[in-house]
C-alpha cells in the first residue's frame, strides 16, 4: 500500500541514543527532522548493553538538557577501577562518568527528542528503501506494520540504526569487519554493594587474559555484571550458561559481593559482536553511533561514542543543510574529524578483542599503573577515551615505563 511523500531537512533512522541526539540538536538549530524508529513502543530500550557512559559525553548530555533528568532520576556518577593479573588494581577516582540502565536512558532521551519543536517521531516505521537523486541520497522509504509505505524526502539522511544498519545495507555502504574472538553474557543484579572511589561508585573492569568481566553500577541499586569468554569456550559455556556465568563472576579477584544480592533479570548473551567500521559519510548521507563504528563492548564506550558522534555531525552540518555543495563539504569534514577522534580507539579495542595474550608492553604499563599514578592517569585517559591510544607512546610516559618510579618522585 502506497502512502504520502513528506519533505524534511533531516531524516534520522533509529531513535536510540545517537538518533535522538541528532534529532534534538538539529531541531534546536531550526531543522525539521523525521525521527524514524522501527519499534512501535516509545518506551522500548536496548537490552544487551553495558549501561556505562563515558565522561567525555557529559558536555553533550548537558547540552541536550538530559543531565538534570538523569540526576533527578538518581543516576550515579561513576569512577573506575581496573584489575589485571600483572599487578592488581589501579583506579581512576576522577573519571566522573554515568551509570544508567537503557531502561531509563532510552525512553528519557526519546521523549526529550520527540518533545523538541521540529521533530516528528515516527514509531513503528522501518526503512525499506533509499530515495536517490543523481549522486546522492535524498531520503528514505519507510513501511509500517500494516504495509503502508511512506516516502520521506530529506536533504540529509542519517543512519543511527546500529551495528547491523539497515540504512548502510540499503545504501550499499559496506563496513570493514575485524574479528571479535570473545563473547559476552550480561545480567542485572540488585543488592551488589558498590565499591566507592572518592565518594562515587566505581565501574570495575577485570582484564583476566583471555577472559574478562565488568561491574557497572546503575540507578535504583541495580548493577550490570558482565562475563566475557574467549570464543574457543563457546560450546562449553553454552552447555551451562548460568553455571559458567556465575563461576566466572564469583571467582573474580576482589569481585562483586553477592552475599545479599539477587539476579533480577535473565542472563542475556551477545555471541556475535563483530568490530565494524564504515565510512562515516557519503553525499547526502551520514552514519553515527554503532552504525558508523561498532567496537568491543567490554570497555563500555558505545554510548559515549553515540552521543559524541551525533553532536559532531550536527555541529559540522547544521548550517549547510540548504546547499548541497556546502553540505557535502561539511560531511567530508565530519568524516575526517570522526576518523581522527574515533578510529584510533576502535583499532586499539578491536585489537584487544581478538583475545590474543596481552603483549609485554601492555603488561608493563598495567604493572606500572599500580605504583605510578602518572601512568595510571595516562591509561585512564585512554580507557575513558579522553586521549588517543597514542598517549601511551608519549616519551614522558614511555620513560616512566622503562624506569620505575615510586609515588612522590619527580617526573
Short names for language-model regions:
Residues 160-255:
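Conserved FAD-binding catalytic core of PHBH/FMO-like flavoproteins
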Residues 27-49:
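Glycine-rich FAD pyrophosphate-binding loop
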Residues 233-316, 320-322, 326:
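FAD/FMN-dependent oxidoreductases across multiple families
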Residues 1-7, 290:
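A short, basic/flexible loop-to-alpha-helix module at the beginning of a structural domain
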Residues 8-35:
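N-terminal Rossmann-like FAD-binding beta1-loop-alpha1 element of flavoenzymes
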Residues 46-80:
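N-terminal FAD cofactor-binding segment of flavoenzymes
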Residues 315-411:
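C-terminal helical "tail/cap" subdomain of flavin- and related membrane-associated enzymes
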Residues 6-7, 59, 76, 81-170, ...:
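Conserved N-terminal helical subregion
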